């Protein structure tokens, strides 16, 4: 095979926040994503499983693009990386009806793909999941080295008596890489995920309780003076019956890092399976 005809396949897993890491890595290499999907995650609650869901496939490039759609059963391996699994009678990949499965999208254009769930067996209570892939196909006239994007969109469907239950064994913050670390067991029949908001202010601004009162745990709004930084916290899911350590990083711009005092307060409000966890971390940093 001639080296000039080698096709490089760049796979981008689009899981809530995980995708941005891979897209960022591609950008650092000078590779701008040509394919985008919205929304990046599909959820059908128990009262929606008979509904049809739609996703929009966008061609961000300057040439027409062909895209092929496929579906897999999946989970995470021990390192929290995507792992393809064989189908089972209860896996959602066996129940999804997708139309169309091959698209031709004009430059800077978009197309809609519809999905419906049609169970082939009586669904067990709880979560059923699949990963739907949108793979950019190599153009026949393409020459040289090509970068093709393969975007995965997780689809979750919930049936019957859904139990979101979890035990949070620990929640810590690593100041070196600005990352929250969670140790969580999902004891129900569906995944759980730590989701919430953070805010950074001066450490001597107020008491811990007063700092927490400024941060709205439902929408992330901040009362009073503008904080140094604020934003959303979310991580990969922990699937039913599993105990996992998951991470959620926050991104601080360089000018914000320089503006921080030698000691600052990081307030966080995190929801895990309906339980709210509130905490203020006092961070000492070297100047």
Language model feature labels by segment:
Residues 8-19:
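Bacterial N-terminal signal peptides
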Residues 45-50, 106-110, 239-243:
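Solvent-exposed, conformationally flexible loop/turn segments
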Residues 52-56, 97-134:
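Ligand-binding face of N-terminal immunoglobulin V-set domains in extracellular IgSF glycoproteins
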Residues 60-63, 75, 85, 121, ...:
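Short, acidic/polar linear motifs in exposed loop/turn regions
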Residues 28-63, 102, 165-175, 179-185:
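Beta-sheet-dominated interaction scaffolds and their linkers
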Residues 28-34, 61-115, 205-209, 215, ...:
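Surface-exposed binding patches on compact interaction domains or structured appendages
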Residues 42-43, 99-105, 232-238, 254-256:
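Beta-strand-rich interaction surfaces with strong enrichment in secreted/lumenal proteins
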Residues 72, 118-156, 252-287:
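Terminal connector regions
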């Amino acid at each position: 095979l001639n080296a000039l005809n080698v096709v490089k396949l760049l796979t981008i897993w689009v899981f809530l926040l995980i995708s941005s890491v891979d897209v960022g890595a591609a950008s650092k290499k000078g590779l701008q994503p040509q394919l985008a999907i919205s929304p990046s995650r599909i959820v059908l609650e128990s009262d929606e499983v008979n509904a049809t869901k739609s996703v929009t496939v966008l061609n961000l490039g300057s040439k027409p693009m062909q895209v092929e759609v496929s579906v897999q059963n999946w989970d995470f391996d021990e390192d929290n990386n995507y792992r393809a699994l064989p189908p089972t009678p209860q896996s959602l990949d066996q129940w999804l009806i997708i139309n169309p499965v091959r698209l031709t999208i004009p430059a800077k254009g978009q197309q809609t793909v519809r999905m419906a769930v049609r169970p082939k067996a009586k669904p067990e209570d709880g979560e059923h999941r699949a990963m739907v892939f949108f793979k950019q196909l190599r153009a026949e006239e393409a020459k040289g080295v090509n970068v093709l994007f393969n975007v995965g969109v997780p689809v979750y469907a919930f049936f019957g008596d859904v139990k979101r239950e979890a035990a949070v064994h620990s929640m810590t913050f690593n100041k070196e890489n600005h990352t929250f670390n969670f140790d969580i067991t999902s004891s129900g029949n569906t995944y759980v995920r730590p989701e919430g908001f953070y805010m950074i202010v001066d450490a001597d601004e107020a008491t811990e309780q007063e700092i927490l009162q400024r941060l709205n745990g439902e929408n992330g709004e901040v009362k009073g003076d503008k904080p140094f930084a604020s934003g959303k916290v979310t991580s990969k899911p922990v699937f039913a019956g599993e105990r996992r350590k998951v991470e959620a990083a926050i991104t601080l711009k360089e000018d914000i890092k320089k503006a921080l005092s030698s000691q600052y307060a990081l307030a966080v409000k995190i929801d895990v399976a309906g339980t709210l966890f509130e905490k203020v971390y006092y961070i000492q940093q070297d100047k």
